[in-house]
């Protein structure tokens, strides 16, 4: 049983029609242009003469409106706040929801030590502003003692008042509720990823996922190592053999209780720490492998979010959890294992373990006869070589792959559709088993991994595989609404795809 205690994962979000007296800082948007910056429209919430005075001061101190630039100035006596923060939105002609989200996040990150802020960014896009502030204010300091814990001046913003012309309108309330739920789900995924493997191992991860599912009213099933052995989950067991902390398989199911509701299966790789096993990784940077359960974190958060939003879609997450360690009991290069469902696999490289646990979970997920299946994983270093650290790769059945990629780009997670070249498939043939877990060369590694997974997807299922090896974890400096560590990608993509399925089938 987990002893983990949940904590607030972001600021309180509220609607407001005016700048209240308890507000410490007013955040406004500033667009850039060749003839100088302009304050983004505030829908009359702040008097135009006040905005004109603010713009003059901002120009005088060098504010340009460049995207995510922040400039803080003292507030005039006409505003009931201590200061005003202008955050750059970039070109007004190119302004979209994602830029508002990023700029809101940049504003939140710059306002450490501030209690309550109000913002007019919500006039431009309420949902994007709410998500950006909530995600930008996320912090993870759970393992800092009093010696190094942030003091009052470094605490994140605790309350954000989103200014709109009609704060009591049903549409505004619904938009804010949805955005707050999405931000909480992304933060939940981040929290899992950021928790070190000393404190988040398979059994603990399973317990915490179970608790989230139970609280959300989901059907929960947890298979321990004995149940995995009994049912033939050879991929999960093989990967977990080297660790004293034994594997799990978690199933979280949300039912829309609607006749003929579309069925969506989610599968996420849950390697709580990946040393590479016997095919051990280099020491440099291995600490970042705490993020190797980023796919699992995202699907757990997404199925809970689908339930909270009450979407008219049946969603089931199947989540394999294991720790990939080298030891005298670990699987070896050259071993043959049997995946759930009967396919035999020659393990050429024990560091290509993610596809082994995913294959078991995909076969199990397909037994539910889903209409759609999305799997996501920090699967291949080749994803980063091909697409960098911020662009997920999407492979799968052509139509659904393109649909997922397009939606991801619309909401700002920017996944890119990738092919699965048929000529690579024969490179996964084995001389001693049905398949090998890697090819005998380094070309197209991300694509070959997807081809491996394709072998386990049932005929007729619309399938998308999202490789987030780079995008799930930010090991460099913060940007936009993304701090260092877990990013929560691709939670927003998956929930948006599920919403699109609900609307359009």
Swiss-Prot record:
It is found in: Cytoplasm. InterPro entries: Leucine_aapep/pepB, Macro_dom-like, Peptidase_M17_C, Peptidase_M17_leu_NH2_pept, Peptidase_M17_N. It is an enzyme of class 3 (hydrolase). Its main location: cytoplasm. It catalyses: Release of an N-terminal amino acid, Xaa-|-Yaa-, in which Xaa is preferably Leu, but may be other amino acids including Pro although not Arg or Lys, and Yaa may be Pro. Amino acid amides and methyl esters are also readily hydrolyzed, but rates on arylamides are exceedingly low; Release of an N-terminal amino acid, preferentially leucine, but not glutamic or aspartic acids. Keywords: Aminopeptidase, Cytoplasm, Hydrolase, Manganese, Metal-binding, Protease. Its cofactor is Mn(2+). Mn(2+) 2 binds at residues 269, 274, 292, 353. Disulfide bonds: none annotated. GO terms for molecular function: manganese ion binding; metalloaminopeptidase activity. GO terms for biological process: proteolysis. Belongs to the peptidase M17 family. HAMAP family: Cytosol_peptidase_M17 (MF_00181). This is Probable cytosol aminopeptidase. It comes from Rhodococcus jostii (strain RHA1). The lineage of its organism: Bacteria, Bacillati, Actinomycetota, Actinomycetes, Mycobacteriales.
